[in-house]
């Protein structure tokens, strides 16, 4: 892949210069969608089970890159999260994410998963850790979840960067969804699209390729 803006690649590397590990995160959340074919008028009469401002995290996929080993993936984990506003997943959500009702029914709360994530990340934090996601949605969703649950935000205290922004800056291209960006780079997509751990893993592979480019 040809790097169109090497100055932006250098800026990305400089941003990460003082950290050893980069955490690649992808969330899945409760959601619903209008049935296909509805007119705008019909959509007004159709009640969604989950509105956009009611979405809650149900999966946290996390992949750790070691920047001292060429941005190699050195660890990964996923956690399901039990939603509280809309505890029953919609058929649309289950079809999109392949997450089953039993997965979230048996999961911890947002705050319990936050604590588990903190414990998992402790060894990496000791040597320097930042986190990234594809876009700003994940950071905003975690903040909304924390406010709703009256608890500390997941990944609180860690600096965040938007990998999607760095991708389009480095390539001087239009902003893309994650899977098209991965495949445009020449990487074969691995796993299920819209599953947190699979998306995080593919994000980690792409970010590693970007950092090693040029």
Task: Specify the residue positions occupied by each region the protein language model found.
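Hydrophobic alpha-helical segments with strong N-terminal bias
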Residues: 10, 43-45, 50, 82, ...
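Metal-dependent phosphoesterase core characteristic of DEDDh/y 3'-5' exonuclease domains
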Residues: 2-6, 15, 20, 55-99, ...
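Ser/Thr-centric signal marking residues that sit
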Residues: 27-30, 48, 97
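Short, surface-exposed alpha-helical recognition segments that flank or form part
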Residues: 51, 105-109, 191
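Short His-Asn-centered micro-motif
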Residues: 25, 107, 133-135
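A short alpha/beta connector and helix-capping loop motif
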Residues: 35-63
């Amino acid at each position: 892949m040809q790097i169109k803006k090497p100055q932006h690649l250098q800026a990305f590397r400089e941003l990460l210069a003082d950290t050893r590990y980069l955490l690649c995160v992808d969330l899945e959340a409760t959601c619903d969608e209008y049935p296909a074919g509805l007119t705008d008028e019909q959509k007004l009469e159709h009640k969604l089970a989950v509105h956009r401002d009611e979405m809650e995290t149900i999966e946290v996929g996390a992949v750790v890159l070691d920047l001292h080993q060429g941005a190699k993936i050195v660890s990964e984990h996923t956690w399901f999260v039990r939603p509280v506003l809309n505890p029953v997943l919609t058929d649309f959500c289950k079809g999109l994410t392949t997450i089953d009702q039993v997965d979230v029914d048996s999961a911890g709360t947002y705050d319990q998963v936050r604590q588990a994530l903190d414990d998992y990340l402790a060894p990496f934090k000791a040597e320097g850790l930042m986190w990234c996601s594809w876009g700003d949605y994940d950071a905003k969703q975690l903040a909304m979840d924390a406010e709703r649950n009256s608890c500390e935000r997941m990944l609180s205290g860690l600096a965040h960067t938007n990998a999607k922004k760095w991708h389009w800056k480095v390539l001087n291209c239009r902003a893309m969804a994650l899977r098209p960006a991965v495949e445009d780079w020449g990487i074969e997509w691995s796993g299920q699209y819209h599953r947190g751990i699979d998306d995080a893993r593919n994000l980690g592979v792409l970010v590693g390729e970007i950092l090693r480019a040029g």
